[in-house]
Amino acid sequence: MPPPETMFCAQQINIPPELPDILKQFTKAAIRTQPHDLLQWSAAYFDSLSKGEPLPVKDRVELQVATQKTDSGLTPGLLKVLNKQLSSKMSVKIADLKQKWTDLCLPEEQLQNILGLDNFQDDIDWLKFLSLGCSALGGSISSALKYACEILTEDPEGGAAHIPFDTFTYIYKYLAHIDGDISEMQIEDVLNVLQSEAERQNGLIQPRNFLSSQCPLLS
């Protein structure tokens, strides 16, 4: 005969006072992020919360971008989440990147396609991976640079999306190198024009500058 179930009264059940707020914040985060696999994402969420690490949470709900073939692929919002989680280190281990990628329920094949664009070893320059991620989102170099500005900027949401000119230069030169068809002369022509713009903007550049008809073609 099985032993009787232990019964507890309300006074014996200790509910942490912060639990309702934790669950409320978790629910809001899940709604904003819309994870493809809620169980997997939830485990990553509470693991990050317990360690005091940046959470795998989007800033807001976002619509599917036109370049996505499915609703489970990389989006600007998810790339921004990865940047928050990994950008504190200039160099990131591929194993750590894969874990964060998996936590966001992103397809392994897409990660391998991005990594395959360069000869990465065990460690990755984070800004290089971010650049390639932006390229995967945008298709063209100008679109990739626009995404990079929107992800890296400290401006308010919907603002001008300024980033330091040095950061822009690094990303542009790297993507031009990966492209392979952009001459050094073309790169220098672009940077010379944009440097003049940056000098008038406290060393910052914004998408409006390189998308302007006054700027030479980026590619």
Swiss-Prot record:
Paired cysteines (S-S): none
Family statement: Belongs to the ropporin family.
Organism: Xenopus laevis
Function: Functions as part of axonemal radial spoke complexes that play an important part in the motility of sperm and cilia. Important for male fertility. Involved in fibrous sheath integrity and sperm motility, plays a role in PKA-dependent signaling processes required for spermatozoa capacitation.
Record key words, sorted: Cell projection, Cilium, Flagellum
Protein's UniProt name: Ropporin-1-like protein
Subunit organization: Component of axonemal radial spoke complexes.
Location within or outside the cell: Cell projection, Cilium, Flagellum; Cell projection, Cilium
Keyword ATP-binding: no
Residue intervals of the RIIa domain: 17-54
GO terms under cellular component: motile cilium; radial spoke
